[in-house]
Amino acid sequence: MGFHAYSSPYDWSRIAGFKATAKTVPGGMIDLSVGSPVDPVPSSVQQALVAGADAPNAHGYPVTAGTADLKAAIDTWFRELRGVDLKSINAAAVPTVGSKEAVALMASLLHLGEGDVVVQPAVSYPTYEIGTQLAGATVVKVDDVTDVDSWVNIPNVKAIWINSPCNPSGEVISADWLTDIVAAARRIGAVVLSDECYALMDWRSVRRNTAASSAPAASAAESNEPASDTAFSLSATPCALNPHVCEGSAAGILVLYSLSKQSNMAGYRTALIAGDYRLVKEMAEYRK
């Protein structure tokens, strides 16, 4: 079927002229546009990259679904940092070449097209909208995706984008709100697309990490966080795959995560999609 033309101008292109003008001002400009990391990549990552370059098959084609070590690392990351046991909720994960391409292709990977509707926040990452238009589907913007009444009765809604912590507002969607969104999406047969690339940048997570290191055996029930928000997670931002949110099943939920923000690795193009086993396995097949 191919890509459809998209009508929304890319935001970074729209502000290019303003950036050029700002750069001529004495002192330069403070660039808050793309959000490219300004701090260096952690030395541990650099060392691992060097070691990986010397691996016996570093020059060969990679495994599409990820190596056994990568799969194990993803499982551990979700379990220890997001409070999610992927296997227990029948979820799978697949690595992607950065998250931007995954976002842009998501509507197409879900076989959406003319007549289908994708809901997204009115103010959000521009690639949500462009990706929907590339698939030929219709974009519907709502002021607040947590207000399920604003979209649940719209005909032909097939997917809902959420972003928590949200860019640019910083708002964190609570576990209760996530539960409502997931339940409403399931009632209408839509997929929840949860962009969680800022999940570990919630400042409240610092307190959680400190508490966990001083009392590693502490249970969720002993913490000051609501029980519905954790299972236990070192991130204070609830995950859409949290068993309390998804009622023990990843069906109809896809979480996108990237190391670009968390580890200053935007140039490394390292990300993943995790969630609904059937959907993720299908996407892994496409990548082959």
Predicted regions and their residues:
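N-terminal small-domain helix-loop-helix segment of the aminotransferase-like
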Residues: 2-98
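Conserved core of the PLP fold type I
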Residues: 58-184, 199-213, 219, 229-248, ...
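Residue-level marker for buried hydrophobic side chains located in beta-strands
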Residues: 192-193
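Walker B catalytic acidic pair
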Residues: 196
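Conserved core segment of the aminotransferase class I/II
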Residues: 213-222, 226-228, 242-288
